[in-house]
Structure formats: structure tokens, C-alpha cells
């Protein structure tokens, strides 16, 4: 979860740096949505997964078979649902939107980094929405 808490200063800095750009507030809101979605997923996984793992270690054979679907559901909901699908959509909006602002006003390396990360996130979102 610490990784998600390091994103808001970057979002706020880039919003302030490119404040003259159109829709920069929308892009910043999308960046903060990434933090909220990711933190909820991280807190859910950090709270539920250790208990399931501990129960699995001490469980009998039949109990282990009963715990597997619970852990698989948690994994699918958080990792595939929240982190790889739901989170990648606002991340794409934030990164590509901020890249468009950086293209006009900022240094070229910042634009390229934001653009590459945005395209990667867009590909992940598209794959998750269409491919699987």
C-alpha cells in the first residue's frame, strides 16, 4: 500500500506544473482515483489473504479444498478486477492526459515516460476488457 501512497504527490505536482492545460483537473482526479482503487485492493488483500493462508496451512484435506475457492475469489476480485482492470482505466486517463499537457509545456523525457506508461496501461485495460 505504500506504493499507492507515493502517487498523490506526483499527481498534485504534475497538476500544479501543467495547471494551464485543458482538463488537467480531470486528469488529476483520475490519478487520485488510481490511488483510491489501488489502496482499497491492497487493504483488502492485506487483511484477508494472511488469514486464508494461515487457515490453509493448518487445515485438513477437505478444509483445504473449501478454502481454495475463497482465496481464488479474493485473488480474482482484487488482482484481476481492481488492479488490472478497474485501476488501469483511470491510470490511462491520468497518464495520457498528463502526457498531452507535458507535450505542449514540459520537457520531452517527461512526455515520453508518461506516454509509454499510459500506452502500457491502455493495453492492459483493453486486454482485460476484451481479451479475458
Where would I find each of the regions flagged by the language model?
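Hydrophobic, aromatic-enriched alpha-helical segments typical of multi-pass transmembrane helices
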Residues: 1-132
Amino acid at each position: 500500500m505504500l506504493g499507492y501512497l507515493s502517487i498523490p504527490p506526483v499527481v498534485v505536482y504534475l497538476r500544479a506544473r501543467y495547471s494551464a492545460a485543458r482538463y488537467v483537473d480531470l486528469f488529476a482526479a483520475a490519478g487520485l482515483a488510481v490511488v483510491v482503487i489501488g489502496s482499497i485492493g491492497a487493504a483488502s488483500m492485506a487483511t484477508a489473504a494472511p488469514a486464508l493462508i494461515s487457515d490453509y496451512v493448518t487445515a485438513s484435506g477437505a478444509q483445504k479444498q473449501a478454502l481454495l475457492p475463497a482465496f481464488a475469489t479474493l485473488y480474482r476480485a482484487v488482482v484481476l478486477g481492481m488492479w488490472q482492470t478497474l485501476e488501469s482505466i483511470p491510470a490511462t486517463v491520468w497518464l495520457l492526459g498528463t502526457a498531452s499537457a507535458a507535450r505542449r509545456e514540459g520537457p520531452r523525457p517527461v512526455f515520453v515516460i508518461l506516454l509509454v506508461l499510459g500506452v502500457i496501461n491502455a493495453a492492459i485495460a483493453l486486454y482485460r476488457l476484451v481479451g479475458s
